[in-house]
């Protein structure tokens, strides 16, 4: 399941409540073509990796979160463990997304 983040508070809360689990954050926008293309794959990964927390941040709805995380383009995927960023890449690269998850869990 992918949790939609609506605020900076909800983002911090999700990172904190994840504990030891890997957190994967998809920063996207409704108008972004590549974001729309990879969204179903991101959701399928959330079903496949039940021990990983998947979050989705709409950069237009949560500009403060996107700014704090220094997101420059969409889609950007960031990876967190224990509240600390442990990885990041931009672009709708399915293989790299799944490979990075496998590397970090």
Swiss-Prot record:
<feature type="modified residue" description="N6-succinyllysine">
    <location>
        <position position="8"/>
    </location>
</feature>
<feature type="modified residue" description="S-nitrosocysteine">
    <location>
        <position position="62"/>
    </location>
</feature>
<dbReference type="Pfam" id="PF00085">
    <property type="entry name" value="Thioredoxin"/>
</dbReference>
<dbReference type="GO" id="GO:0005576">
    <property type="term" value="C:extracellular region"/>
</dbReference>
<feature type="disulfide bond" description="Redox-active">
    <location>
        <begin position="32"/>
        <end position="35"/>
    </location>
</feature>
<keyword id="KW-0249">Electron transport</keyword>
<feature type="active site" description="Nucleophile">
    <location>
        <position position="32"/>
    </location>
</feature>
<feature type="modified residue" description="N6-acetyllysine">
    <location>
        <position position="39"/>
    </location>
</feature>
<keyword id="KW-0010">Activator</keyword>
<keyword id="KW-0702">S-nitrosylation</keyword>
<dbReference type="GO" id="GO:0005634">
    <property type="term" value="C:nucleus"/>
</dbReference>
<protein>
    <recommendedName>
        <fullName>Thioredoxin</fullName>
    </recommendedName>
</protein>
<comment type="function">
    <text>Participates in various redox reactions through the reversible oxidation of its active center dithiol to a disulfide and catalyzes dithiol-disulfide exchange reactions. Plays a role in the reversible S-nitrosylation of cysteine residues in target proteins, and thereby contributes to the response to intracellular nitric oxide. Nitrosylates the active site Cys of CASP3 in response to nitric oxide (NO), and thereby inhibits caspase-3 activity.</text>
</comment>
<keyword id="KW-0007">Acetylation</keyword>
<keyword id="KW-0805">Transcription regulation</keyword>
<feature type="modified residue" description="S-nitrosocysteine; alternate">
    <location>
        <position position="73"/>
    </location>
</feature>
<keyword id="KW-0804">Transcription</keyword>
<keyword id="KW-0539">Nucleus</keyword>
<dbReference type="GO" id="GO:0015035">
    <property type="term" value="F:protein-disulfide reductase activity"/>
</dbReference>
<keyword id="KW-0676">Redox-active center</keyword>
<dbReference type="GO" id="GO:0009314">
    <property type="term" value="P:response to radiation"/>
</dbReference>
<feature type="domain" description="Thioredoxin">
    <location>
        <begin position="2"/>
        <end position="105"/>
    </location>
</feature>
<keyword id="KW-0963">Cytoplasm</keyword>
<dbReference type="InterPro" id="IPR017937">
    <property type="entry name" value="Thioredoxin_CS"/>
</dbReference>
<feature type="site" description="Deprotonates C-terminal active site Cys">
    <location>
        <position position="26"/>
    </location>
</feature>
<feature type="site" description="Contributes to redox potential value">
    <location>
        <position position="33"/>
    </location>
</feature>
<dbReference type="GO" id="GO:0043388">
    <property type="term" value="P:positive regulation of DNA binding"/>
</dbReference>
<feature type="modified residue" description="S-nitrosocysteine">
    <location>
        <position position="69"/>
    </location>
</feature>
<dbReference type="InterPro" id="IPR005746">
    <property type="entry name" value="Thioredoxin"/>
</dbReference>
<comment type="subunit">
    <text>Homodimer; disulfide-linked. Interacts with TXNIP through the redox-active site. Interacts with MAP3K5 and CASP3. Interacts with APEX1; the interaction stimulates the FOS/JUN AP-1 DNA-binding activity in a redox-dependent manner.</text>
</comment>
<feature type="site" description="Contributes to redox potential value">
    <location>
        <position position="34"/>
    </location>
</feature>
<keyword id="KW-0813">Transport</keyword>
<dbReference type="GO" id="GO:0005737">
    <property type="term" value="C:cytoplasm"/>
</dbReference>
<keyword id="KW-0964">Secreted</keyword>
<keyword id="KW-1015">Disulfide bond</keyword>
<feature type="modified residue" description="N6-acetyllysine; alternate">
    <location>
        <position position="94"/>
    </location>
</feature>
<feature type="modified residue" description="N6-acetyllysine">
    <location>
        <position position="3"/>
    </location>
</feature>
<dbReference type="InterPro" id="IPR036249">
    <property type="entry name" value="Thioredoxin-like_sf"/>
</dbReference>
<comment type="similarity">
    <text>Belongs to the thioredoxin family.</text>
</comment>
<dbReference type="InterPro" id="IPR013766">
    <property type="entry name" value="Thioredoxin_domain"/>
</dbReference>
<feature type="active site" description="Nucleophile">
    <location>
        <position position="35"/>
    </location>
</feature>
<feature type="modified residue" description="N6-succinyllysine; alternate">
    <location>
        <position position="94"/>
    </location>
</feature>
């Amino acid at each position: 399941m992918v949790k939609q983040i609506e605020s900076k508070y909800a983002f911090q809360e999700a990172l904190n409540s994840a504990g030891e689990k890997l957190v994967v954050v998809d920063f996207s926008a409704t108008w972004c073509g590549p974001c729309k293309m990879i969204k179903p794959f991101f959701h399928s990964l959330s079903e496949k990796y039940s021990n990983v927390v998947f979050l989705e941040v709409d950069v237009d709805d949560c500009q403060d979160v996107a700014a704090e995380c220094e997101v420059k383009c969409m889609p950007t995927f960031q990876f967190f463990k224990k509240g600390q960023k442990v990885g990041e890449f931009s672009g709708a690269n399915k293989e790299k997304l799944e490979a990075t998850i496998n590397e970090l869990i």
